[in-house]
Curated annotation (Swiss-Prot):
Keywords: DNA-binding. This is Histone-like protein Hq1. It comes from the Bacteria. GO terms for molecular function: DNA binding. Residues 1-17, 39-50, 71-117 have a biased composition (Basic residues). Signal peptide: none annotated. Residues 51-68 have a biased composition (Basic and acidic residues). It comes from Coxiella burnetii (strain RSA 493 / Nine Mile phase I). Residues 1-117 are annotated as: Disordered. Binds DNA in vitro.
Length: 117
């Protein structure tokens, strides 16, 4: 049986190149998978954002409609009731605008209450 032939440098180089190409192929596969996953995630995020927008839009629409209905109901209320209400309602005092408001009144009710001496 003849002895095993030694590989020539050219053969050695070729095999090395092949292994390198295999490595790059694996890398390519991994990067492809990563890109696919990224794309999927992006699509899902877009879908979610769209759903959120739609939901908020629907809510706003409903709110507007409800407000409109309430306003309409108020308009159609009996006028006698309205008049009665106006007559019995007490007007708020409000603040007198003769003098500027004191700073102490602004601070009232903040922090620790003062001791009554």
């Amino acid at each position: 049986m003849p002895a095993k032939k030694r590989k020539t440098t050219r053969q050695r180089r070729r095999s090395k190149a092949r292994s390198a190409s295999a490595n790059t192929a694996a890398l390519r596969k991994v990067s492809k998978e990563r890109d696919q996953a990224r794309r999927k995630l992006r699509a899902a995020q877009k879908k979610l954002a769209k759903a959120k927008k739609d939901a908020s839009r629907k809510l706003a629409k409903l709110r507007k409609e409800a407000a409109r209905k309430v306003a309409a109901a108020k308009k159609t209320r009996a006028p006698s009731k309205k008049g009665r209400k106006k007559a019995t309602r007490k007007k708020g005092g409000g603040r007198s605008r003769k003098t500027a408001r004191k700073v102490s009144t602004m601070k009232r009710g903040r922090g620790r209450p003062r001791k009554k001496a």
